[in-house]
Amino acid sequence: VTPPERPWRGRRLHFVGVGGAGMSGYARAAHALGAQVSGSDRAASVYTERLAADGVLNARIGEHDKANVPDGEEVEVVYSSAIPAENPERVAARARGLSERPRAELLAELTALRRTIAVAGTHGKTTTSAMLVRALEAAGLRPDWLVGGSVGEGQDNAGWTGTGEWLVVEADESDRSMLSLHVDIAVLTNVELDHHATFGSVSELREAFRAFLERARTGIVVWDRPELLALVPARAGAEVVGGAEVVGEAEVEGGFGVGAGVEVGAGAGTEAQIVPYDAPAPALTDGGSYFTWRGHEVALSVPGAHNALNATAALEAARLAGAEEDRAIAGLAGFHGAGRRFQLLGESACGARVYDDYAHHPTEVAATLAGARTLAHERLIAVFQPHLYSRTAMLAREFGAALAEADVAVVLDVYPARELAEDHPGVSGLLIAQAAADAAEGGPVYWLPTLADAEPVLIDMLGAGDVCVVMGAGDVDLLARKLIVSDNGA
């Protein structure tokens, strides 16, 4: 698909919830492919502002209403898993006999138009995807992308020029949409139960990731851990032994991102090269790291050992896609993080640095704070807004333990998203605050339920040299932005 070819010309797509990171990207891609697009959301966002500025669409902002759905019998109404069936715009679509399209279905269509690299895993999808985009761009491969956050300075969460061969997407397990994608290269970063409403057990989750990997036609990039390598599909008789998968006389080598790869079956009638990766003992610096990959030194400007792992996964996927290794590495040198992934927003009035992060699982909170600790010359202050009552109830103790690693922890009430408080009696952010206080053994923990409660306390609390990390998948980024007086252009 190269300009001026626009295969979706004549289609009319209406996006319900277009202000989100995912849906706004699909609207942008559909517009680039020639479709007429419209959208609505309850609140304006940076994404609706960018869509308007770029001439893609002017979203209707406010309560969802049937009047938002354009006239015409050919309109397709696209919705995400966060939009319930009783949403007025979905109800109107059904009453008018319009086509209702789940977000996952549209993404599957998009992946059929390109050779697709799909990044899956419980943690690290957005950062790994953003790094991969930067590596492919630096190598001259002109990728398109649909990512859950901006991929870097001056770049958006989605880009679709139609001039390159590759599309980079996140493969979301929360609604099993990863199982509908057309995948050439699959990346699997890790597996941990997070979406309890979708998966009843870890074994059920693992089977879903196994099915995802079976969709890969060209390559599988997987963290070199036995429990993940065990999910890699292979011909009958293949055996997973420790960190190496044995296929006849050949091995898929483990060993820290140096996997040589071997041809094994990965789905009916397909073959994929399997590449395990790792990044052992990166040298952590003030806000970055150094490590060696395939004989090259890699320098990152994002903190934490987890980001060295993300970068290694991205580099291996880029290599499989045809990128020259040194050019791909150069593309990561100037990467300072994806949007809402340890994103420096600016400084407070007293000179504290304020970061925004999407962490909403204990493992993510712990990794984010470990990375932030390398930057904190004074106190590390963690501000956390839990996301979903169900997750809070299941993981309160684990969240508390992670937050206790900060010098000061501030816990807000739950951002409910699609859940209702009455369905989860007795569950609030206070459960996490109490768990953090127990784990902190006397360290300061604040329970400040609302953004309005937290703002004045934090403004008074922050001091020069502090690092304040505001975490959560809800609207807590609004609080983070109110804490700064000089921004970082974010």
What are these regions (language model features)?
Residues 15, 29, 103-151:
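Walker A (P-loop) phosphate-binding motif
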